[in-house]
Amino acid sequence: MLCSRSSWCGLILLLCWTGSGYLCGGQELPQPVRVLDVMRISADQPPEAGVVTLTPPPLGQGVSCDVLVVGAGTGGVAAALAVAESGHSVCLTEETKWVGGQMTAQGVAALDEDRYIESGGATASYLKVRGAIRAYYQQHYKLSPAAARDKHFNPGNCWVSDLSFEPAAALQAIESMLKPYQSSGLLRIFMRTKAISAARSGNRVTSVLAYNFETDGWTSFRPRYVLDATETGDLLPLAGAEYVPGAEARKETGEPHAADDADPKDSQSFTYTFVLARDSRQEHRIPKPPDYEKRGDAGFYSFSVDYSNGKTLTYRMFERSPGTPGSFWAYRRLVASANFVGRNMPREVSLINWPGNDYCGPALLSKDADQQAQALREAKITSLGFGYWLQNEAPWAPEPATHSRASSGAASGAGAPRDIQAADRRGYPELELVPSVLGSKDGLSQFPYIRESRRVKALKTIREQDISALNQKGTRAIFFPDSVGVGWYPIDIHSCSKGNFSIETRPFQIPLGALVPQGLENLLPAAKNIGTTHISNGAYRLHPVEWAIGEAAGVLVDFAMDHDVTPAVVAGDDRLTEQVQIALVDRGVPIFWYDDVAPETPVFRDAQLLAQRGIFGPNQTDLHFNAGGSVTLAEAVTALARLLGWGAVPSKRAPAENKLALEAITLLAAQGYLPAGPYAPGELGRKLQWSDLQMACAKTGVEAPIDQGEFKPATRGAFAVWLAQLYRRTLGTANPAPSP
């Protein structure tokens, strides 16, 4: 009997192998399958050394959990935490040795963030990781006086990120957050474990079979929900989900920068990062990797970067070239020696994640393990080739005698050996590849930094024009009523077909609909595999956004289980979506863009919900909420009318003559919320006093804040607190408010 996705083919533990042509039901043995083990890929070995041939057993060890999170990267960790914190059981798998993804195993430990990350652009749990990373250095080392005074202490003092660090710091932070749930039994982590197949019954994934590369053991997971948090969307093809690889055509998406024709093989480059230290006492040249001349002689390796806007900048190794933001060394430096004092100082190291070690090859998203292995090996050779070029052929320039340790990165002494100071010298042989920082044997990251995944065909697809500053002329990107998170980063495309390019964006939201696949009930994306396009993914793939995606996915499935509904049902119901948004905001997840309302601020929850529901808060000139500012009478009466669901009052700010505010007053007065007036149009621009709301307080039973005088102007923060109390009382009774 041939196995199909709509049947178990026998016993519940017997698995479906339709994707590989397996037979099940116990009538025939499963056929061998080739499986990629990313940790076995080596530049010194043929690609087949990174592929194992496995024969899945008809029965695997059965493990049941409420939610299976496949992939313990940035999104997977956030999702697992959200589910476990709700009291549901979680199984979390990871094919490398480290949890944390971009922050750890992929080596991108200089966080790609927006400038408001600490004041409104990140979730509370993401900020907790950042705080723990800083604490790691404060606890293990003695900081310099300047670093100790710096509230925003950056261990690496790099110029591309506000927080750069060794992966070990993030690993410790993340593991400490996961540990309580492991101890309680709510969370089980399966390291070096990879999903091999998935079985379906109708539109539900019923089991996922996974293999452990260290124990050779097989596990059959039987969860209620599956979250695909893999770096390349591995569960999507295994589960038969509809997805998009590569680039869409302009006629499909209407995106200005989309190509005329779709190209499934046109994905962004990926990168094996590596870490260098500087030891001026000796040389540390690595062997020339295979096929080095193919890239080296072609000028592939360079300090110059083409920014696709007609501007090319050429950097120097240890000093800043005119017109550049900083030196090559300080670009993604993870530890700056100038930040530390005393004998027990960490070694200064720099992460190398540069166009020179980007690799282009479509095979990474192939279903063929041998093709994937070939691409990964070539990517490793590319990165090692860049390291070789830096040591042997990079343009050399003497450093100024007055250089500082912070700017030069000379952790092992200010000068360089006599032979390196020669005018005709090329390369920096004092640069040392440091494998221990990345936990690998060859000095390269355990997993390549993935910029583009398979992307699920979701209920909502985010397009370039939804977030691009060229299309969105306001202070924020397009408003998504079903927002479950926020992010902000340029559309940053490391293109393999048309050259790298970057598009400015507006601060954007993550719509719930982008997390819900078409045609599947219990499989959700939880990383960079959500409903984006080849282009819009360039802004949604970064650390804090991927974390927010994973956290939202975790909260969504938690809500679905508690209320016995599917995510698709939630996505189609405004009130259910609203309840998910409340759950997110209550745990410190911003869903609306403010740059001055961080999760720890007292007014965070109220400001977020009122703005997202189109009731009160935002303006069209900046990202501020301005909690200490005043509220006009016109703003207050219009907000109250919106909250009560009187759709006759639009969400846009009233015109100068305040006709809309006067209409709101008429409606409110007729229902006993306000005195009948009359109100002169000019009076509506005055500051709101709590005495103006006496009748509304009496009618609703929501009292004004006790610390606010009756005739004192109400602050925006205090008014939001009062209004939010009323909002929570009216949940389920008012009509949905229009968008702000």
Q: What kind of region is each of these model predictions?
A:
Residues 74-75, 84-127, 134, 212-221, ...:
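Mature catalytic domains of secreted/periplasmic carbohydrate-active enzymes
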Residues 576-740:
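N-terminal propeptides
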Residues 9-21:
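Bacterial N-terminal signal peptides
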Residues 1-10:
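Bacterial N-terminal signal peptides that target proteins for export
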Residues 32-38, 88-89, 94-193, 197, ...:
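Conserved N-terminal/central alpha/beta ligand/cofactor-binding core
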Residues 29-48, 58, 102, 190-195, ...:
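Flavin (FAD/FMN)-binding glycine-rich loop and adjacent Rossmann-like elements that form
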Residues 23-26:
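Boundary at the C-terminal end of the N-terminal hydrophobic targeting segment
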Residues 59-73:
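Beta1/beta-strand and adjacent pyrophosphate-binding region of the FAD-binding site
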